[in-house]
C-alpha cells in the first residue's frame, strides 16, 4: 500500500472517507467510536507510597533494620530508635528526589491548539481538537496549530513550522503535489502536515489521516512510555557498592558472632558485638551526603547556565564519553546571517561590502526593499532569511526603515511556493523599478541581462555557467542562496506575473545559521577530554556537514549520513556503523534512539542534546539527556536530566568538567567515610579477639556517622575543582568505586585510625573502667576522623602544602566537629544519652594528640605510595 504522501488529495479522501466529500454526521460518530478521541494517553505511574517503600529495598537499609530490631530486643531502645529515625529520614529524602512528575506526555498534549476549524455540513465550524477524527477536513490560516496528521488538499503559499518534530529551523513550504519516492523522511513530505506543528504563512486545508497516538507526536509519546530512564554511573556504582558492602558486613558479623560464642560469650553479648560491627560498617549518612553534594553541584552549574532537573545527572555528566548534539541553536547561533555576496562577478564577504560601488549598493538596497520582515528595537518579525538581509543592512549603516520610507513599495507579487519568487515595485531615483528575489535557477531562467559595476550587459551562457557554479559552491558549503534581479517597469500599472521576465541579474546573497563563536573551542576541548562529539540533526546533510567541518566535528564527507541509510541496517550493523559517522542528517526520533542505544551497547556513557518534541525519546534513552532552555519545547525539557539556559554546546563542556570534579569529590567523601568506618570495624574485631569489652556503643557510631562525619564528608564534596580533569579520559563504564587502589587506601588509613583508637582504649581500660575506655575510644575515633578529613583531600600528600587550607568548608567542619565531641565528653547532662563519662583535661589532650598523629602517619603512607606509583 502506498503512503498518503504518494497519493493525490482526492485519492486520500476516498481512502479515509470512502468518497471525495466531507464526512457525514453518521460517519463522524462511527469514526469517533472506531478511532477514539484525538488525545495522547498516559501510562500508569507509581504512587508516592510505592516509591517510599522502594527506598527500603537497599541491602544496607535492610541490615540497619535488622540492627535496630536486635538493639530493641536487647533492651537498647535509644539505639534502636536512632537507627529507625535515620532510616526513615533517608527514605523520605530518597522519595522526594525520586518523585518527579512525569510531565512529558502532559506537555505533548499542549502542542495541539484547543480548537480546530473543521468543514462539516458545508460549513466551517470550530470544535475542540480532541473531537477531530480521521476523515475530517481541517481549514488552516496563518498562526493555526495543526491538530492532527493529514494530507494537504488546498495550499496557498503555506509555510509550516515543523521544528518541534524535525529539528529544521526554517519554515517548510508546502504543496499539494504527489511525491513519487518511497521512504521519504518526515521533513521532506511537503504535501503532509503533522500534529504539533503550526502554520506560519498562507492558508490551506487538509484531510485528517491519523489522530491521537497514531500521529507522529503520538508515536513519540509511545516511545517516551517505552523508553526507560537509565541509571547514571554513580547510581550503578553506589548500588554495586551497597551490595558488596552488605555481603562483607554480613560475613564480618557472622565471623564476629561465631568467635564470640566460641569463646564462651553469652549470645546477648555476641549479638551486641555483631550489631556494633554492623552499625560501625554502614555509612548511614552516605546517601544524604551524596544528595547534598550533588545539590551544591546543581547550584554551581545553574550559575553557569545549566539547570539540573535530575540530581544524579550532575555526576553522570562527568562520565560521558559520547555527546550527541543537535545542530541548530546548540552548535550554531540559531540566527540566519549573511555570509557572502556574489556581485560584479566576484564573491565578497558580507563585512566587505562597499556601498560606494553602484551594483553592490543596489543589491543591498534591493534586499531591504524586496523583503517583508522588520526589526524594530531588536524585535525581529518575519522569515529568518529575510531578517538576515535586514540585519546586514543595519550592520553596514543602512537604516532599513529609512530606506523603505525613501523608496516606498507601490505594488507587489507576493512569494508563493510554485513560482519560488517574489517581486516588489518601487520608484528608485524617479525610475519605476521592479525588484525580484527568488531561487537562483528560477531567476536565471528569466534573466536576459546582467549588471556589473553599475553597467548593464547582455547575459551570456558563460556568465550563466559561472553564476550557477558559484551557487553550487555556496550550496556545498551549506549556505542558503537567494538571487536578486530587477528591471524598469511602467509607472502607472500594478505588477503582474507577466512582468517577471526579461530581468537584469544583480547578484546572489548566501546565508546560513553560523556556528557559535565558542563551538569550535568547545569541540576541541571535548576531544582533548576523550569525549567524541557527534552531530544529529533534522536538517539537510550538506548544511549539517558544512557546519560540522567548520567546528571540527567532521573531517571528511564519508563521516556524514542520512537517516534513510539507518533504516536499512539492523541494530548489530548499526553498532559497527556508528564508529565511522560523526554527522547524522534528516533523522527521525526512532533513528536518534537507535544511534544512542548503539553507542551505549558499545560500552559508552552517552549524552544527547535536543530541543524538539522529536528529541524527547532520545533524551530519555540517553544516560544524560540535555534540553535547550531558550528554544526547547516543554516536552524535551521534561524528558531531559538537564536544561541549558543559554542553549550553548560550550555549556555542556563546562557541565562535564563540573561532573568530573564532583565525582572526584564524592569519591573522596566515600573514602573518608569508609576508611573511618573500617577503623571502627578493626577496633571492634580487635576488642572481640582480645576478649575486651565492646569499645563502642551503637549510639557512639551513629553520632560519628551522622554528625561529626557528615560535615567533613560534605565539605570534601565541596573541595575546590581541579583544572586538570579535562585532560583525562572518561572513566570506564564498568569502573567500580571500590578499585584496588581505593581499597588499599581505605585499609591503610583504617588501620592507622584503629591503632590510635585502641591505644586510647587501652589507656582508659588500665584500671578496668570499661566506660572510661569506651569514652576515650569513642572520642579518639571521632577526632581521628575529623583530622582524617584533611588526608582525604587528595591521594597525594597535601597537608604540608598550601592546598590544605584551600577548603574553608572543611576547616569549618573540623572546628564544629571538635567542639561537638568535646561537649559530649565534658558536659554531664549529655553522658546518659551518649553512654560516656567526663574526661579530664589530660585525657582530652591524650585523645587530641593520638587523633592528630593520623595526619603525619597517613601523609607518609601517601608519599611512599606515590613514589612507588612512579
Please place each PLM-identified region on the residue numbering.
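Conserved cytosolic headpiece of P-type ATPases
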Residues: 1-727, 737-738, 751, 761-762, ...
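Generic alpha-helical transmembrane segments
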Residues: 708, 753, 775-789
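Non-catalytic, peripheral interaction segments enriched in hydrophobic/basic residues
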Residues: 756-758
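Membrane-helix interface and helix-disruption motif detector
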Residues: 766-770
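Membrane-water interface at loop-to-transmembrane-helix junctions
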Residues: 732-751, 771-776
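A C-terminal functional module that forms or caps the active site or interfaces directly
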Residues: 792
Amino acid at each position: 500500500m502506498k503512503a498518503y504522501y504518494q497519493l493525490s488529495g482526492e485519492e486520500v479522501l476516498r481512502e479515509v472517507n470512502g468518497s471525495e466529500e466531507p464526512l457525514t454526521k453518521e460517519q463522524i460518530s462511527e469514526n469517533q467510536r472506531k478511532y477514539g478521541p484525538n488525545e495522547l494517553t498516559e501510562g500508569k505511574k507509581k504512587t508516592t507510597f510505592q516509591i517510599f517503600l522502594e527506598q527500603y529495598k537497599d541491602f544496607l537499609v535492610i541490615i540497619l533494620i535488622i540492627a535496630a530490631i536486635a538493639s530493641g530486643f536487647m533492651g537498647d531502645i535509644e539505639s534502636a530508635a536512632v537507627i529507625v529515625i535515620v532510616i526513615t529520614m533517608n527514605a523520605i529524602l530518597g522519595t522526594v528526589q525520586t518523585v518527579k512528575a512525569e510531565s512529558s506526555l502532559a506537555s505533548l498534549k499542549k502542542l495541539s491548539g484547543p480548537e480546530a476549524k473543521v468543514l462539516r455540513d458545508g460549513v466551517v465550524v470550530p470544535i475542540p481538537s480532541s473531537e477531530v477524527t480521521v476523515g475530517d477536513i481541517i481549514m488552516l490560516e496563518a498562526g493555526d496549530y495543526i491538530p492532527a496528521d493529514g494530507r494537504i488538499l488546498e495550499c496557498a503559499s503555506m509555510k509550516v513550522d515543523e521544528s518541534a518534530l524535525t529539528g529544521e529551523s526554517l519554515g517548510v513550504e508546502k504543496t499539494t503535489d504527489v511525491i513519487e519516492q518511497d521512504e521519504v523522511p518526515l521533513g521532506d513530505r511537503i504535501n503532509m502536515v503533522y500534529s504539533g506543528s503550526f502554520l506560519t504563512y498562507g492558508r490551506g486545508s487538509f484531510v485528517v489521516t491519523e489522530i491521537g497516538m497514531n500521529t507522529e507526536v503520538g508515536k513519540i509519546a509511545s516511545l517516551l512510555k517505552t523508553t526507560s530512564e537509565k541509571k547514571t554511573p554513580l547510581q550503578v556504582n553506589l548500588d554495586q557498592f551497597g551490595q558488596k558492602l552488605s555481603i562483607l558486613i554480613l560475613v564480618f558479623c557472622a565471623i564476629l558472632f561465631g568467635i564470640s560464642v566460641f569463646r564462651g560469650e553469652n549470645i546477648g553479648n555476641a549479638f551486641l558485638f555483631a550489631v556494633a560491627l554492623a552499625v560501625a560498617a554502614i555509612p548511614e549518612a552516605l546517601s544524604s551526603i551524596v544528595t547534598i553534594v550533588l545539590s551544591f553541584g546543581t547550584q554551581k552549574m545553574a550559575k553557569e547556565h545549566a539547570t539540573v532537573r535530575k540530581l544524579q545527572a550532575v555526576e553522570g555528566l562527568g562520565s560521558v564519553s559520547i555527546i550527541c548534539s543537535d545542530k541548530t541553536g546548540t552548535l550554531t547561533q540559531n540566527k540566519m546571517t549573511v555570509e557572502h555576496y556574489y556581485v560584479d562577478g566576484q564573491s565578497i564577504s558580507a563585512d566587505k561590502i562597499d556601498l560606494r560601488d553602484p551594483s553592490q549598493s543596489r543589491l543591498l538596497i534591493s534586499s531591504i526593499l524586496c523583503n517583508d520582515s522588520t526589526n524594530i528595537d531588536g524585535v525581529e518579525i518575519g522569515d529568518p532569511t529575510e531578517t538576515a538581509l535586514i540585519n546586514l543592512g543595519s550592520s553596514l549603516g543602512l537604516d532599513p526603515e529609512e530606506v523603505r520610507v525613501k523608496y516606498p513599495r507601490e505594488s507587489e507579487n507576493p512569494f508563493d511556493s510554485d513560482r519560488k519568487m517574489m517581486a516588489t515595485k518601487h520608484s528608485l531615483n524617479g525610475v519605476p523599478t521592479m525588484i525580484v528575489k527568488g531561487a537562483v535557477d528560477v531567476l536565471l531562467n528569466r534573466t536576459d541581462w546582467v549588471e556589473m559595476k553599475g553597467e548593464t550587459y547582455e547575459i551570456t551562457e558563460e556568465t550563466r555557467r559561472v553564476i550557477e557554479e558559484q551557487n553550487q559552491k555556496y550550496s556545498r558549503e551549506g549556505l542558503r542562496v537567494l538571487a536578486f534581479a530587477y528591471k524598469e517597469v511602467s509607472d502607472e500599472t500594478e505588477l503582474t506575473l507577466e512582468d517577471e521576465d526579461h530581468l537584469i541579474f544583480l547578484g546572489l546573497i548566501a546565508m546560513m545559521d553560523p556556528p557559535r563563536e565558542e563551538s569550535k573551542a568547545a569541540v576541541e576541548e571535548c576531544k582533548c577530554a576523550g569525549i567524541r562529539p557527534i552531530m544529529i540533526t533534522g536538517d539537510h546533510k550538506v548544511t549539517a556537514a558544512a557546519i560540522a567541518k567548520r567546528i571540527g566535528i567532521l573531517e571528511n564527507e564519508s563521516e556524514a549520513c542520512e537517516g534513510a541509510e539507518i533504516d536499512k541496517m539492523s541494530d548489530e550493523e548499526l553498532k559497527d556503523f556508528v564508529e565511522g559517522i560523526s554527522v547524522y542528517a534528516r533523522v527521525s526520533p526512532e533513528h536518534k534512539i537507535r544511534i544512542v542505544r548503539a553507542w551505549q551497547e558499545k560500552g559508552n556513557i552517552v549524552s544527547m542534546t535536543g530541543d524538539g518534541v522529536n528529541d524527547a525519546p532520545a533524551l530519555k534513552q540517553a544516560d544524560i539527556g540535555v534540553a535547550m532552555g531558550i528554544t526547547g519545547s516543554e516536552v524535551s525539557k521534561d524528558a531531559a536530566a538537564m536544561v541549558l539556559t543559554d542553549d550553548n554546546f560550550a555549556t555542556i563542556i563546562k557541565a562535564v568538567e563540573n561532573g568530573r570534579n564532583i565525582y572526584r569529590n564524592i569519591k573522596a567523601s566515600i573514602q573518608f567515610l569508609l576508611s573511618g568506618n573500617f577503623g571502627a570495624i578493626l577496633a571492634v574485631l580487635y576488642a572481640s579477639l582480645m576478649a575486651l569489652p565492646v569499645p563502642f556503643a551503637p549510639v557512639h557510631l551513629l553520632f560519628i556517622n551522622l554528625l561529626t562525619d557528615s560535615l567533613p564528608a560534605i565539605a570534601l564534596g565541596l573541595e575546590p575543582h581541579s583544572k586538570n580533569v579535562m585532560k583525562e579520559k572518561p572513566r570506564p563504564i564498568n569502573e567500580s568505586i571500590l578499585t584496588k587502589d581505593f581499597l588499599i587506601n581505605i585499609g591503610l588509613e583504617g588501620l592507622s585510625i584503629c591503632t590510635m583508637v585502641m591505644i586510647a582504649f587501652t589507656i582508659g581500660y588500665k584500671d578496668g573502667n570499661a566506660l572510661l575506655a569506651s569514652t576515650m575510644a569513642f572520642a579518639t575515633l571521632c577526632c581521628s576522623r575529623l583530622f582524617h578529613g584533611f588526608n582525604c583531600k587528595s591521594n597525594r600528600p597535601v597537608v604540608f602544602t598550601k592546598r590544605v587550607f584551600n577548603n574553608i568548608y572543611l576547616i569549618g567542619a573540623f572546628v564544629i566537629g571538635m567542639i561537638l565531641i568535646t561537649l559530649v565528653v565534658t558536659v554531664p547532662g549529655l553522658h546518659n544519652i551518649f553512654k560516656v563519662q567526663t574526661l579530664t583535661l589530660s585525657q582530652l589532650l591524650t585523645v587530641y594528640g593520638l587523633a592528630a598523629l593520623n595526619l603525619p602517619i597517613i601523609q607518609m603512607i601517601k608519599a611512599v605510595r606515590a613514589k612507588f606509583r612512579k
